[in-house]
Amino acid sequence: GGTGETWETAATVPGQKTAIALAYSPSDSLNPFQVTTEYNYYLIPLVYEGLFRINDQFQAENLLCESYSNEGNQWEFQIKQGVLFHDGQELTARDVVYSIQQAQSSTCFAVRSQNIASCTASGRYTLRIRLNSADSRLPLLLTMPIVQRNTGAEDHPPGTGRYVVEDVDGTVTLRANESWHGGRVPITEIRLSALYQD
């Protein structure tokens, strides 16, 4: 073994600025509902989160969802309180409704949401979903990104994830989200290296 320090070990030093670079396509969007390239698609989970994530055993784990219950094709979800979007606004059930509606018309996520007949916010943190047909696997499908409502036309709408998109004169960087609900982010900066394709 060499004596060189990997970025994983360097990232554990408190207060140390640690950066890595990842490829992305500048001609494509970082909006999770408009993304078309594989490069940018793989960046989405760094910036956005779903109600659930899929663990190593391919099971749904709560992420932005606090708890849920269902009876037949009717589901109710309690959204985690105190989760902030990158612009400081709090996540609510209305943002989740908006995001599911965006997903239903998105190339990437339409298949996951095609069984959803209706989706409504019945309180600030309560989401109700009615399915066309009962499906116990619904949490596995609700991994689609949640964005702030009414931001669907933006190139990178506010998310709740570990990184915030910073675009300065065409140079795009992902910076650690200092108010991320999951705690401290070890890698403070991800520089996006543009791939120019013909």
Residue map of PLM features:
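A structural signal for short hydrophobic beta-strand segments in well-ordered beta-sheet cores
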Residues: 67-68, 118-120, 163-165
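N-terminal lobe/hinge region of extracytoplasmic solute-binding protein
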Residues: 22-70, 78, 101, 113
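Aromatic- and charge-enriched surface segment that lines or borders ligand/interaction sites
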Residues: 66-107
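Short, low-complexity disordered leader/linker segments with a strong preference
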Residues: 1-16
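Residue-level recognition of beta-strand termini and adjacent short loop/turns
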Residues: 121-125
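Short, well-ordered beta-strand elements
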Residues: 15-26, 74-77, 96-99, 127-129, ...
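Short, solvent-exposed loop/turn elements at domain surfaces
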Residues: 27-35, 59-61, 86, 137-140, ...
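Gly/Pro-rich hinge or "lid" segments in bacterial periplasmic/extracellular proteins
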Residues: 130, 134-197
